[in-house]
């Protein structure tokens, strides 16, 4: 019979579920490892900050504090501070270009009255008069001369509690620190050939890049971090800076874990971020002396660069957040210069840069964890923008600078004119830098930040180098790709396809020939014959059947089987405990939920309709379990489904599982079932209608719900294809024999075909009404 397809789906859907569970168990197998952290470990508290774990190192990120290094003579790199950490009084550092600058620094202990001391400077004994009036602070003094035979003069003393000093070669000058901690600041000495100046350090020292000068000043004023002051920090030779380290590859694809369909990939990438700001300058109406707005706006930038010998195409979007609104009002006259609003980004602002490139890391960026990034800082300086007035000198907005420092990374989506891109959003915090900005020929001057007038300063782009690392869940087959759009969009598209397919299915109901339908309903439709009309390859058909089974196991019919199994178990235990009790609840509990509704037949007499309706909803499963020779509702449902599948033009592998499952649940919702005992028939429908009548005369008799419950448990259940009202109408108008009546009651397909071939209007109308109930 055609209903075989539903029984196959019920059986095989649980096979699919079992297979899925076995694969899941295999993929989630774990190994327990016991770690003894020792008696001093803080084992009672979880980490406060959950990080991504190890992030592979790269060449692009410099350490803030590099060292300590042993005393030595070398040529320090330009634009790097030497942070000197002497432990005793005496000569700290000396350096010369051997032309016009000899500079040395000495350290004097606290509480030293004026005294003459001998120091060895550049290999010569030199007498120097020194003093330190401070009772607690050490004193650094610079000794400088401009000729080899000249006398030393003292400059730029620094009173220091931490006993730290700094010197740097930068921009044709030698910079040092002076003043008094904790408010020390920098000064400088001009020199020629500054880049060739060799330094001799007589104490341990550190190297700090100019970009981290604020940190260097913090150390000078407040001391080194506590970990640098332990005996575990051992100075090394300066030549160790030249050791070639084995660094991570610019491109790394690492398989973290793998299952049957998915794998976790860790992607590590060296990246070059190029970005630019965009702005909007709007002029007000009038005589041309007023501007309404100078503001930032998002800017897209596409570029290529080389990574590990491979050309990478990248796309960035730069936007700002937390801007500061300024204005300038030169007066109330129509010819007075006015800017109603101009935006400035400062230390309370953020810059967002969304980055995407065409590498494998961004192909499947949907399910991502352990995202981390290390990026260098970059300084952005403002250029000159002239406000063109009709008459008079142009006001010029000039200057302004900020530094961008990495403050985090998250997932984002970039929207271009043609496509949306899953990307990474790098967040940057800002710090203001020199010079301040001003508007020439106005009173606006000495303000800090980067104004929106000309933020790129005639540069095509700013550039940041860095590295990111992430772990992404991707398909095991590299040819597959997770969808760019989110699941909601995909589901909405599927719902649209299903809606169109439902309309097509419902319209096809009128094209089904009833004689062919009866023949098709008698065929043993299995999954292969059911889906054979769909144009697809064998592999696609197998995949389609699997998808149908996976969807079908979540249907209400499959859920009813699970509930029924529990009910059978409860009924068996109930009957074994009280075998002598024969009530509706104990007898029918195997197939109904009557035990939850009523326990006494006298109390439930008024709710027979409710009881029979509840019983009828379970009789579909009872009928499947006790298959008879008669045709049932599922045979008609499956035959109609097969006919519509063959005729459909919109069916595909995505919609078929939904349609088959919906058909099993929604086709022929108004069903009636009957049981036969001798000459009596008891019939009940899902909508709560019930009848009891004689076979020969179709005379109605009182409906005995107790008897119905007993027969449902012990006798075959039959689909009332031709229901009581149709039978009675047929008998009243045409007259039928007892044998014909029994065959129609048993839903004998041969008798049904005879009536249809004879074009009996009553039977034809009944079958047509069932076909019209096969709607989605």
UniProtKB/Swiss-Prot annotation:
Any Pfam family matching the protein: VP4_helical
Motif DGE motif, chain ranges: 308-310
Gene Ontology terms: biological process: permeabilization of host organelle membrane involved in viral entry into host cell; virion attachment to host cell
Region (Spike head): 65-224
Residue ranges of the region described as Hydrophobic: 389-409
Site (Binding to sialic acid) residue list: 101, 190
Gene3D superfamilies recorded: 1.20.5.170, 2.60.120.200
Note: In group A rotaviruses, VP4 defines the P serotype.
Annotated region (Spike foot), positions in chain: 510-776
Motif mapping: KID motif: 644-646
Site (Cleavage): 231-232, 241-242, 247-248
Gene Ontology terms: cellular component: host cell endoplasmic reticulum-Golgi intermediate compartment; host cell plasma membrane; host cell rough endoplasmic reticulum; host cytoskeleton; membrane; viral outer capsid
This protein's name: Outer capsid protein VP4
